[in-house]
Amino acid sequence: TTEIYTLSLHDALPIFSSLVIFFLMNLVGYAGEKTGVPYPVLARASFGVWGANLAALVRAVVACFWYGAQTAAASGAMVALMVRNDALLSFHQTTHWLGHSGLEVICYVVIWALQLLIIQRGMETVRRYQDWAGPAVWIAMLVLAIGLCVKAGGFSFDHGIPMDVLLDKTKDAGVSGAPGSFWALMAVGATWITYFAALYLNFCDFSRYAKNKEAVAKGNLWGLPVNLIAFSLVAGITTIAAFKVYGEVLLHPEQISAKFDSWVLALLAAVTFAVATLGINVVANFVSAAFDISNVFPKRIDFKRGGYIAALIALALYPFAPWEGGAAHFVNAIGATMGPLLGIILVDYYLVAKGNINVAALYDEHGEYRYEGGWNVNALIATGIGSVFSTILPNFTSLLPVWWGTYGWFFGVLIGGGVYWVMATLRPRRIPAAA
């Protein structure tokens, strides 16, 4: 019974998590499609025409951190490939700059620059990159999985990994609990859902270009539940096969590529991971930061300049590498900061405004969304209270249980949205009289 129960949890985890992600993306996506505005402008409906700048800056700061983290991840794949050369390996081991090896710094700057080349040509180039990057990554992943399965002597979901090894790996990843247990799987699912916290907020940056509501749902269906579940299966098969071949649990593509005898397979793995990471980085972080920063200073900073500022901040963060350490802890801590914002925006759009937004007033500093001097006090209070429980207490104090931080984003959404709903009921918005 226990084995069946555990297996059912393993089966349900990617399905349930991907459906939650799909649902949340649709909620934000529909708002973007209907209003035709990006996240910083949509936020004006709930935060006020000036208060939205606060929401935009929070998202921009998070985007800069993620931009640096994803760039570092992609450059790590390059490093794993380069150190196969004895001279480069020696350079990697003996040269240190800015708290990193010289090779790591060079690879980081190269990946950082490559992203700028893609981005500086505008959103159409970003779209074309995504069009070919997605299929290319899938083809490479399948080749990698098939190659490892052949080398392992067959395909199997029976991993045969010792429990002590699994315990070490889950602890390294920042996930508590015994592998396969209910609470460990819950933590993995929560981290997976939280991973998309930044994109939930700014998905309307992309959905505003959709033809209709159905197009948003169809695109999300194929891109999220279908793609996520299939990709999880392939990744799982690859990890199991790699364990059977190399006797180690290798969680990162660059770790697998470092084991290959073939330069061709190593290059394929490195390029696959780099292309996939760059695709995520450009869409989820660069575009968002560019829109957010340019929205705060629209007269001085356009989309491209906003993106360049975000890229420079990510470059400046590299010596400090705040993303190094437990991946799950980083995802949950940084994602939690955006929970209250999402809760407030969704509650305002669907429960307070009932989906009826005066788009013209979003661009009028003296219009319906001026609130108190351009700031909606209800949203500010809800953000503050939500942030206390989602970010401040779990990350900077020991007042809450250790497990709380894993679900910080969820608490942020619920508490931030709940407080906003109560305050909007007690202090309904007042529409300024026409001048």
Q: Which residue ranges define each predicted feature?
A:
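Single conserved hydrophobic/aromatic residue that forms the stacking wall/gate
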Residues: T1-D11
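Selective recognition of specific alpha-helical transmembrane segments in multi-pass small-molecule
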Residues: F16-L24, V58-Q70, P135-K151, T191-A198, ...
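Membrane-water interface regions at transmembrane-helix termini and the short interhelical loops
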Residues: G29-Y30, S46, L54, A80, ...
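Transmembrane alpha-helical segments of multi-pass small-molecule transport proteins
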Residues: A56, V83-Q120, P135-L144, V188-F203, ...
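Membrane-interface loop-to-helix entry segments
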Residues: V58, A69, I106-K151, I161-M163, ...
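Hydrophobic alpha-helical segments and their helix-loop junctions in multi-pass secondary transporters
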Residues: T71, S75-R84, A136-A173, Y195, ...
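Hydrophobic, membrane-embedded alpha-helices of multi-pass small-molecule transporters
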Residues: C107-Y108, G147-A152, L167-T238, W263-V283, ...
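C-terminal membrane-solvent junction of multi-pass transporters and transport-like membrane proteins
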Residues: A136, L342-V422, L426, A433-A434
